[in-house]
Amino acid sequence: MARIGDSGDLLKCSFCGKSQTQVKKLIAGPGVYICDECIDLCNEIIEEELADADDVQLDELPKPVEIREFLEGYVIGQDTAKRTLAVAVYNHYKRIQAGEKGRDSKREPVELAKSNILMLGPTGCGKTYLAQTLAKMLNVPFAIADATALTEAGYVGEDVENILLKLIQAADYDVKRAETGIIYIDEVDKIARKSENPSITRDVSGEGVQQALLKILEGTQASVPPQGGRKHPHQEFIQIDTTNVLFIVAGAFAGLDKIIYERIGKRGLGFGAEVRSKAEIDTTDHFADVMPEDLIKFGLIPEFIGRLPVIASVINLDMESLVKILSEPKNALVKQYTWLFEMDGVELEFTNDALEAVADQAIHRGTGARGLRAIMEEVLLPVMYDIPSRDDVAKVVVTKETVQDNVLPTIVPRKPSRTERRDKSA
């Protein structure tokens, strides 16, 4: 055992040589001792090596074309939004790696500014799903926050730092990994200020939240309460740098299209109005011509808009797109329900007319792709209730009448096996 002095009373660390009086703890092994300081140093070395191993190299970073192709496998339509997101995400992570290379090289690096993303478009068109799919592809921590739950510091509600806590939790409290994650803030249009002019009175859930978000959007060293909730002076904080966190903020922005049309001179009613069918109006990209001045008029403050330089818009899905969503993606609803029925030994089939009827109902309800599952549940509920208790069903066929007129699906009976036929004849 490592000892100091002739008395043999003091033990010392076998690695750094410090005595037990110079360190907080000394841990004994078979014939050796190690102090808490040496343990901390070992942990730091291991963490650095693991972080270097986990960093995605630039040649491994998927190119914009590859990102878009990956999104195609999960999200139907929205081609413009996919291209915009693919380029923005590629440039964002290229910027992070450029910063790391710049620290290692002797040449003075060019500082690349962060490009957060603003997504505009109606509900149920794939805004959230696009962001989730991106995070899955890149294997980075991903967190979703609701802007309507946020309030300015000091008021009842969530602080903006709680958004960062969700990201840290998604990274299993690995702060270094969380610092390169993606945060998706939904319903951002609901925190627009009530009027175009700056408010004299305090708007704690609107303009106040926009002001509070500015620093973390731009990049700052934030102090996050580890258990969430409000900050108090006696708790320890998690420090996280948001410089390399990609923020995607999204909202439906109902009424913004009218502001855009007023500016560019398009008329929807009266003499000189552009005559278009309802289908054309529904699938038009109303936000294609959006400008910062339109967003300011809607109620976003200029500083907030300035931190969201990339704008991607999604459009209402037409019937053809909704039918494809039902059957084509890797996690399509038809595939999900087919698998559920297969687990009970029953084949499930949808006719093309039935899929079109489901899509038509989703369009009439105005819920977009998000409403497809609710309609499928309503249609399949009677058979999902009965079939697990029956062993005489081979196949269930869902037709147009099943969806439109609430007629029960067609049930194809299972042919008895040879053993069953022999038992009956006996």
Swiss-Prot record:
GO molecular function terms listed in the Swiss-Prot or TrEMBL record: ATP binding; ATP hydrolysis activity; ATP-dependent protein folding chaperone; protein dimerization activity; unfolded protein binding; zinc ion binding
Keyword Chaperone: yes
Pfam family, any one: zf-C4_ClpX
InterPro entries named among the record's database cross-references: AAA+_ATPase, ATP-dep_Clp_protease_ClpX, ATPase_AAA_core, Clp_ATPase_C, Clp_protease_ATP-bd_su_ClpX, ClpX_bact, P-loop_NTPase, Znf_CppX_C4
Keywords (A to Z) from UniProt: ATP-binding, Chaperone, Metal-binding, Nucleotide-binding, Zinc
Annotated binding of Zn(2+), by residue: C13, C16, C35, C38
Assembly information from the UniProt record: Component of the ClpX-ClpP complex. Forms a hexameric ring that, in the presence of ATP, binds to fourteen ClpP subunits assembled into a disk-like structure with a central cavity, resembling the structure of eukaryotic proteasomes.
Primary role: ATP-dependent specificity component of the Clp protease. It directs the protease to specific substrates. Can perform chaperone functions in the absence of ClpP.
Protein name (Swiss-Prot/TrEMBL): ATP-dependent Clp protease ATP-binding subunit ClpX
Gene: clpX
